């Protein structure tokens, strides 16, 4: 007798071994048709995903997985990657298959082929995938020995797959999945038949080196997306279109904010308007430092290699560091700011009464990121962090973490981000410090989030090598997630670098060090801001807050006068005194996302007024200049958007 416990606690008895599919059928025909797999927990074991054909030999807990579950969607995407490889082999028999994992919102598969795949090839492959899916071929799991699998794949000319399998220990039993004439190595699980794969689309082809090594052959990576329903896929494709429209690289070029060029890969050339935006962000964060007990500091860009060895960075991070030599000494260009802040702390002797001691820096860092991973401002080699380090006692740790989370939430709201996700990243395999230290650090982070009422997930093994951290992830206007701020506990670096304070018993002790950043990379955060607002920055951030346009030459002097008046009040204002038609001026400045356009002619000049247009078609009519200045000042003080109604100004 086999007893199966379902998620609602109900139990079903079977006379002998039973498959996941049979359990689903016993519950109902609808569930049996929808079943893609199962989540099984057997006595003494961890939950794991299995195929519908998996046989339950003993009592177990079972949840039927369908397309409505996240695991079910992953199974659909994984199986669609296999369907892609199946279709490619049908159309291009000489192509060799390599790997095909699930990624965010889809999948990819890498192929070796004698010529590049064309857009026409992609269309043909997608059509073939649809044909194979409609055949509803059964997907079956088979177990092979390693040597048999190597021999098989070599015999059919699949050298890459044979190489992968040959690297697996000889005594390990392998699982292969078969659908029609196609067989592939895979742990699984997979959907029960190709007919379950109804909604998918191939997106693009890109290059990828075999095993990620630039010394190896360049393969062709076909990306695709797959979904449970057509509505879900349509929503995703619409989001991609919107993301393309909001691409910070395009907007940065169109609005004359910044540019990139080949002579400086991963680095940014800031134009005047872009740098004005940068300054607003930096000045805001400087006020955050000042208002929350941080002392701003500045540490050197390069430090002797001996210091990076002491911190552990050289052993754990050397491949990402730039180095330089001078007078027979080797220096590392800093990838992080923390060692410099410890040196500042160490420059004097500190009492426990001074703690917590908070340092903040707009620290410029450089990391030797692979050229293929660079992406506009989102992935760069040179960047500036709003980097802070808090030196405190163990007793102060939770308070500091909780206070930081509350501060971070306010900052994000001010910048227009209202949804934050929280993750605690725990100890990685490659780390420094004892398990006892890691236990203390992880507990402190989790308790601080509980105290601030934040629900959080745990990301096992995702912490930095020197300590666990909280990762703060933002959700933007089109639903994308951006990992942004962090706070990280570090018991190790202060000890390694000899940081000490004198406690109440007049004993020297190492402080706890918190690494914290709210924005993270300012470059990346500004890229996020640009995309979140589609380039239309709220007045407090806009590089140019208003443009004064004269209708004709007689009103040009009045336009210039207004511009100077507003500038003297601290506003970022420009004038447009060209002899162009006013409609053209309005259109041009609207395309430049200027929050306010002030139009003045003879009537406005006589009455000392301005006709005000707000971005997005907002018509504020003709008002006194003083009233406009007051409105703009309120916009800046409240950090509100230009189209926000007056009734919700407070």
Curated annotation (Swiss-Prot):
Enzyme Commission number(s) of this protein: 6.1.1.3
Residue ranges of the region described as Catalytic: 247-538
UniProt subcellular location: Cytoplasm
SUPFAM superfamilies, alphabetized: Class II aaRS ABD-related (SSF52954), Class II aaRS and biotin synthetases (SSF55681), TGS-like (SSF81271), ThrRS/AlaRS common domain (SSF55186)
Protein origin, superkingdom: Bacteria
Entry cofactors: Zn(2+)
Gene Ontology molecular function: ATP binding; metal ion binding; threonine-tRNA ligase activity; tRNA binding
Cofactor binding notes: Binds 1 zinc ion per subunit.
Keyword match Aminoacyl-tRNA synthetase: yes
Ranges for domain TGS: 1-66
Gene Ontology biological process terms in this record: threonyl-tRNA aminoacylation
Known catalytic reactions: tRNA(Thr) + L-threonine + ATP = L-threonyl-tRNA(Thr) + AMP + diphosphate + H(+)
Residues where Zn(2+) binds: 338, 389, 515
A GO cellular component annotation in the UniProt record: cytoplasm
Keywords for the protein's UniProt record, in alphabetical order: Aminoacyl-tRNA synthetase, ATP-binding, Cytoplasm, Ligase, Metal-binding, Nucleotide-binding, Protein biosynthesis, RNA-binding, tRNA-binding, Zinc
Predominant cellular place of this UniProt entry's protein: cytoplasm
Pfam families referenced in this protein's UniProt entry, alphabetically: HGTP_anticodon, TGS, tRNA-synt_2b, tRNA_SAD
Subunit organization: Homodimer.
Function (record text): Catalyzes the attachment of threonine to tRNA(Thr) in a two-step reaction: L-threonine is first activated by ATP to form Thr-AMP and then transferred to the acceptor end of tRNA(Thr). Also edits incorrectly charged L-seryl-tRNA(Thr).
NCBIfam families in UniProt: thrS (TIGR00418)
Name of the protein described by the UniProt record: Threonine--tRNA ligase
């Amino acid at each position: 007798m086999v007893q199966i416990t379902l998620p609602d606690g109900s139990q079903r008895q079977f006379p002998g071994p039973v498959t996941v599919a049979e359990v689903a059928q016993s519950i109902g025909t609808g569930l049996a048709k929808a079943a893609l797999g199962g989540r099984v927990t057997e006595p003494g074991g961890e939950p794991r995903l299995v195929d519908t054909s998996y046989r339950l030999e003993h009592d177990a807990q079972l949840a039927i997985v369908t397309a409505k579950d996240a695991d079910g969607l992953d199974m659909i995407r994984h199986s669609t990657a296999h369907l892609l490889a199946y279709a490619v082999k049908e159309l291009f028999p000489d192509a060799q298959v390599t790997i095909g994992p699930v990624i965010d919102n889809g999948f990819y598969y890498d192929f070796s082929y004698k010529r590049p795949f064309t857009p026409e090839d992609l269309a043909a492959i997608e059509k073939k995938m649809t044909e194979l899916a409609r055949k509803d071929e059964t997907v079956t799991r088979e177990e092979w020995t390693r040597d048999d699998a190597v021999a098989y794949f070599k015999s059919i000319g699949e050298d890459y797959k044979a190489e992968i399998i040959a690297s697996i220990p000889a005594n390990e039993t392998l699982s292969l999945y078969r659908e029609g004439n196609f067989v592939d190595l895979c742990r699984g699980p997979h959907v029960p038949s190709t007919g379950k794969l109804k909604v998918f689309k191939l997106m693009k082809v890109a290059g990828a080196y075999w095993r990620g090594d630039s010394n190896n052959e360049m393969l062709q990576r076909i990306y695709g997306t797959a979904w449970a329903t057509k509505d879900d896929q349509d929503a995703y494709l619409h989001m991609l279109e919107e993301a393309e429209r909001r691409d910070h690289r395009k907007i940065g070029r169109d609005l004359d904010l910044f540019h990139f060029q080949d002579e400086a890969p991963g680095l940014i050339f800031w134009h005047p308007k872009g740098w004005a935006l940068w300054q607003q962000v930096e000045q805001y964060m400087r006020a955050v430092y000042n208002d929350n007990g941080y002392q701003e500091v500045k540490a050197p860009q390069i430090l002797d290699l001996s210091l990076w060895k002491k911190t552990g960075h050289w052993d754990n991070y050397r491949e990402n560091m730039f180095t330089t030599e001078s007078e027979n000494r080797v220096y590392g260009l800093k990838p992080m700011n923390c060692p410099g802040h410890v040196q500042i702390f160490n420059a004097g002797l500190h009492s426990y009464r001074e703690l917590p001691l908070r340092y903040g820096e707009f620290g410029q860092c450089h990391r030797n990121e692979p050229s293929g991973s660079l992406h506009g401002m989102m992935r760069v080699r040179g960047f500036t962090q709003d980097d802070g380090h808090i030196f405190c006692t163990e007793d102060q740790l939770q308070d500091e973490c909780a206070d930081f989370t509350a501060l971070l939430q306010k900052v994000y709201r001010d910048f227009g981000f209202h949804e934050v996700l929280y993750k605690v990243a725990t100890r990685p395999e490659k780390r420094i410090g004892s398990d006892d230290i890691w236990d203390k650090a992880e507990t402190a982070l989790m308790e601080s989030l509980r105290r601030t009422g934040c629900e959080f997930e745990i990301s096992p093994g995702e912490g930095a090598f020197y300590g666990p951290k909280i990762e703060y992830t933002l959700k933007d206007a089109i639903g994308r997630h951006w990992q942004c701020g962090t706070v990280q506990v570090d018991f190790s670096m202060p000890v390694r670098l000899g940081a000490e304070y004198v406690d109440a018993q007049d004993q020297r002790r190492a402080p706890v060090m918190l690494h914290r950043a709210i924005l993270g990379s300012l470059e990346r955060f500004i890229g996020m801001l640009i995309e979140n607002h589609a380039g239309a920055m709220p007045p407090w951030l806009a590089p140019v807050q208003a443009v004064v346009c004269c209708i004709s030459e007689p009103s040009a002097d009045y336009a210039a006068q207004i511009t100077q008046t507003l500038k003297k009040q601290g506003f970022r204002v420009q004038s447009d005194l060209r002899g162009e038609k006013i409609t053209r001026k309005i259109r041009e400045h609207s395309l430049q996302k200027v929050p306010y356009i002030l139009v003045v002619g003879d009537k406005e000049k006589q009455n000392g007024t301005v006709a005000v247009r707000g971005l997005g078609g907002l018509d504020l009519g003709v008002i006194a200049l003083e009233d406009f200045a007051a409105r703009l000042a309120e916009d800046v003080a409240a950090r509100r958007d230009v189209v926000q109604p007056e009734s919700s100004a407070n």
